[in-house]
């Protein structure tokens, strides 16, 4: 699919060009200036706001306020996960804004993820119910299999043996997927998808699915543009959700001397030319690729800034510069999980 799509906004006026996306009607732009993010229409007809608030590695005690600030700033998409251990704070923020009358539940798009210790089909529903309880919600808009790799069932999020090696579950993610489909049938989730799946793993899911995944949430930034995987997913009408779009500079395992995409001189030059921040440039880059993007922040100014990316356009030349940083630079490689039969990156598969 090589559709060239040009979409015109009413206010502020600009044109955005998206290549290799497919059906023009599947990327809808809202007409209200900054009031709402554009939405991607998924293959099941459900709509996902193109910018969401990420909550990975958000400090305890700060998440509730971050969610409230985000909703006030216009965000309607919140991305969370059981393993982040802050879903209760996300729920408090959402509940507060609903009680204030700022939003209704149906205005929001809430995503969470099934953790690796709950891959066994009989555990999937109870895992979701725990998440719903923490979030104080009756349903999720989107539920993802967080990783294709199952871990040993139990209370430990990262179960290990006496030598520190991760203990695996023999469950195949295709069996987990069938249990995910039942959640849709029961009305507990509206859409289901995957995260960190490579091409072959998605193909295996599609082979058994009666409800196909609507999105693949993957690491995506200029050091890792994921062009092959994105093209494959979009050929199957699977949207992309980009995590770590700013290069995850505060990731706990970062080492001194690791490159920081926000500090790259060429990115800063583009930002200065546009009178924008480097972060806004990187978020806009994902938006122009028709990718959903979920930057994380707990800082009010940054949360608001990350949302203000709809009043400018990157030129093809600027996009070429941004993509020149591609180096297969994966920042979330899960090296300590090498050896798992379902590790998505060990064989450098896309």
Curated annotation (Swiss-Prot):
Sites binding substrate sit at: 146
Where would you find this protein in the cell? Answer: Cytoplasm
Entries under PROSITE patterns matching the protein: ALDOKETO_REDUCTASE_1, ALDOKETO_REDUCTASE_2, ALDOKETO_REDUCTASE_3
Instruction: Give the binding site residues for NADP(+).
Output: 244-306
Going by the UniProt record, its keywords in alphabetical order are:
Cytoplasm, NADP, Oxidoreductase
Q: Does the keyword Cell division apply?
A: no
The main location is cytoplasm
Give me the Gene Ontology terms describing cellular component.
Answer: cytosol; extracellular space; mitochondrion; nucleoplasm
One GO MF term, please? Answer: all-trans-retinol dehydrogenase (NADP+) activity
Effect of inactivating the gene: More compact border cell clusters that are delayed in their migration during oogenesis. Integrins fail to localize to the cell surface in border cells. Impaired IMD signaling pathway response in the fat body, but not in the gut, upon Gram-negative bacteria infection. Conditional RNAi-mediated knockdown in oocyte somatic cells slightly delays border cell migration and produces a more compact border cell cluster. Conditional RNAi-mediated knockdown in oocyte germline cells has no effect on border cell migration but results in an elongated border cell cluster.
The record's annotation in InterPro entries points to: AKR, Aldo/ket_reductase_CS, NADP_OxRdtase_dom, NADP_OxRdtase_dom_sf
Q: Provide the GO biological process annotations.
A: D-glucuronate catabolic process to D-xylulose 5-phosphate; fructose biosynthetic process; polyol biosynthetic process; sorbitol biosynthetic process
Enzyme's top EC category: oxidoreductase
Instruction: Give the active-site positions.
Output: 84
Site feature: Lowers pKa of active site Tyr: 113
Q: What induces it?
A: By oral infection with Gram-negative bacteria; induced in hemocytes but not in the fat body.
Q: Which reaction does it catalyse?
A: an alditol + NADP(+) = an aldose + NADPH + H(+); all-trans-retinol + NADP(+) = all-trans-retinal + NADPH + H(+); 9-cis-retinol + NADP(+) = 9-cis-retinal + NADPH + H(+); 13-cis-retinol + NADP(+) = 13-cis-retinal + NADPH + H(+)
A Pfam family per the record? Aldo_ket_red
EC no. given is: 1.1.1.21, 1.1.1.300, 1.1.1.372, 1.1.1.54
PANTHER family (alphabetical): ALDO/KETO REDUCTASE
Task performed by this protein: Catalyzes the NADPH-dependent reduction of a wide variety of carbonyl-containing compounds to their corresponding alcohols. Displays enzymatic activity towards endogenous metabolites such as aromatic and aliphatic aldehydes, ketones, monosaccharides, bile acids and xenobiotics substrates. Key enzyme in the polyol pathway, catalyzes reduction of glucose to sorbitol during hyperglycemia. Reduces steroids and their derivatives and prostaglandins.
Q: Which family does the similarity line name?
A: Belongs to the aldo/keto reductase family.
**Name of the featured protein:** Aldo-keto reductase 1B
Q: Give the species this sequence originates from.
A: Drosophila melanogaster
Species classification: Eukaryota, Metazoa, Ecdysozoa, Arthropoda, Hexapoda
């Amino acid at each position: 699919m090589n559709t060239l799509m040009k979409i015109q906004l009413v206010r502020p006026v600009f044109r955005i060009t998206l290549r290799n996306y497919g059906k023009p009607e599947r990327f809808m732009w809202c007409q209200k200036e900054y009031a709402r993010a554009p939405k991607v229409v998924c293959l099941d007809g459900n709509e996902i706001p193109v910018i969401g608030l990420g909550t990975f590695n958000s400090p305890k005690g700060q998440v509730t306020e971050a969610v409230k600030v985000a909703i006030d700033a216009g965000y309607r998409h919140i991305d969370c996960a059981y393993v982040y251990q802050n879903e209760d704070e996300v729920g408090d923020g959402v509940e507060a804004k609903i009680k204030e009358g700022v939003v209704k539940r149906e205005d929001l798009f809430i995503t969470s993820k099934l953790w690796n210790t709950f891959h066994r089909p009989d555990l999937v529903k109870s895992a979701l119910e725990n998440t719903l309880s923490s979030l104080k919600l009756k349903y999720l808009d989107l539920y993802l299999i967080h990783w294709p790799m199952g871990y040993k069932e139990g209370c430990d999020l990262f179960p290990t043996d006496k030598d520190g090696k991760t203990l695996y579950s023999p469950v195949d993610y295709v069996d987990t997927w069938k249990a995910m489909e039942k959640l849709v049938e029961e009305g507990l989730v509206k859409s289901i998808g995957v995260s960190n799946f490579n091409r072959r793993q998605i193909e295996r899911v599609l082979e058994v699915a009666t409800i196909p995944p609507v999105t693949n949430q993957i690491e995506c930034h200029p050091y890792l543009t994921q062009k092959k995987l994105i093209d494959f997913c979009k050929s199957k009408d699977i949207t992309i959700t980009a995590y770590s779009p700013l290069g995850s500079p505060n990731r706990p395992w970062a080492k001194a001397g690791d490159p920081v995409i926000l500090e790259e001189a060429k990115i800063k030059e583009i930002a200065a030319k546009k009178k924008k921040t480097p972060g806004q440039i990187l978020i806009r880059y994902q938006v122009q690729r028709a990718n959903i993007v979920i930057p994380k922040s707990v800082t009010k100014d940054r949360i608001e800034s990350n949302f203000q990316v709809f009043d400018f356009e990157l030129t093809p030349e600027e996009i070429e510069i941004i993509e020149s940083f591609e180096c297969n630079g994966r920042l979330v490689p899960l090296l300590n999980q090498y050896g798992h039969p379902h590790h998505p990156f060990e064989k450098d598969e896309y």
